[in-house]
Amino acid sequence: SYGNMPIGSSIKPLSVYGPAFDLGNSPGSPVINAPLKIEGWTTEKGYPSNFSDGSYTGVETLRYAMVKSNNTSAAQALFSYVGIENSVNYLLKLGVSSNHIEATGAGLALGASGLSMIELAGGFAAIANKGEYLEPYAFTKVVASDGSIYLDVQQEQIRRQVFKESTAWMLVDVLKQCVGNNGTGSKAKFGGFTIAGKTGTNSDYRGVTFAGMTGYYTCAVWIGCDNYKALVSN
């Protein structure tokens, strides 16, 4: 339930690529992946670094950018295709508390924002549910001793369409590739299931995140130390 631990790249489908697809782009749309200054990026260098210098490809598709989790591409896509305000609004509609959103390039494109795992799972569940967000609950109903229903989630639960169905389909298609042999989440593929998901690693390996879905369930996990101590590796 921690909301102050950055979730890293797991945020990208919710804050960058989902909104980009929803606003008229596609997995095949081009994005610049090069060490060039990005208008709107506020660090002195002017752009975020990728995991390795050899990952700069020049121009790549949004699909490739998400599968390889390239930070420079995500930042370019955020400022070229989405915008800070739109990105924040999508996260709010996906049930993320405004207190957990860092409305900056780093917060939205790199995952410096500290979403809780129930917020992250709720966002990915909306992707799995054809773009419709259903407020997560830890129960289905509360029944009194006489059998009367005190609370029923189906009556209390907030529901809203956040992404178009076509956007959700494109996201699932790309997220399946993220868990494929060449994706950053390949180790999450198991048991012959169709799995779609996205990894996230924050600075100094202080935490590792994965949010994913099958045809039955959506889950989000954060692996790290209670004292936020750096892990040995990712």
Predicted region positions:
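A penicillin-recognizing enzyme superfamily signal
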Residues: S1-G3, I7, S116-G122, A126-N234
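Active-site SXXK
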Residues: P6-V31, A65, G123-I127, L171, ...
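A generic secondary-structure signal for well-formed alpha-helical elements
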Residues: F21-P27, Y81-V82, L91-S98, I127-L134, ...
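Conserved catalytic neighborhood of penicillin-recognizing serine enzymes
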Residues: N25-S87, S145-Q177
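Surface-exposed patches in mature extracellular/periplasmic domains of secreted proteins
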Residues: G28-S29, S98-L108, E135-F139, N182-A188
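Structural recognition of the beta-strand scaffold that forms the well-ordered cores
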Residues: S29-P30, Y64-M66, A74-L78, Y90, ...
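Mid-domain, small-residue-enriched loop/turn segments at the edges of structured enzyme/sensor domains
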Residues: E44-F51, Y81-G122, A138
